[in-house]
Amino acid sequence: MAKKKILVVDDEEDVAKGLKVRLKASGYNVVLASDSVQAFMMANKEKPDLIILDIMIPGGGGFVVAERLKQSAATHRIPIIFLTGVPGGEERAYKLGASAYVMKPYQPEELMETIHNALEISRGESGETVTAATSATS
């Protein structure tokens, strides 16, 4: 099975690079963007399986990015996880179709579980078959 690709959009370089290291260590391919323009470009060019998006990014902010991505036929099915230090945006995020809203500072294990769950749900919605391991008893 091919590695899943995740687009991380955050203008804080240390956050983005730290997340990239953690995601790569967990077996994901990772691409980075630091503003709204790069986020749109990379989402359309790279076709990620999931987007991790900060709210406070240059060029319009994460909510504008999410809204435009969800309106585009090419990107509307990509799950979006907001990862942000901005409290109070959960309702707006979910109205825009977010899969999750995670506050910074985040617990790495919880974020990884959230990513895994969003990818599993997305895979099921896209029509991919999800196979369960079965054990035969003899």
Locations of the language-model features?
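Hydrophobic/aromatic residues positioned on beta-strands within the core alpha/beta folds
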Residues: 81-83
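The feature encodes the CheY-like receiver
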Residues: 16, 58, 76, 104
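Short hydrophobic/Thr-rich beta-strand motif most characteristic of the beta2 strand and flanking loop
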Residues: 27-34, 42
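Charged docking surfaces used in two-component/phosphorelay signaling
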Residues: 17-25
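Active-site beta3 strand of CheY-like receiver
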Residues: 46-52, 57
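Acidic catalytic/metal-coordinating carboxylates
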Residues: 35-38, 61-65
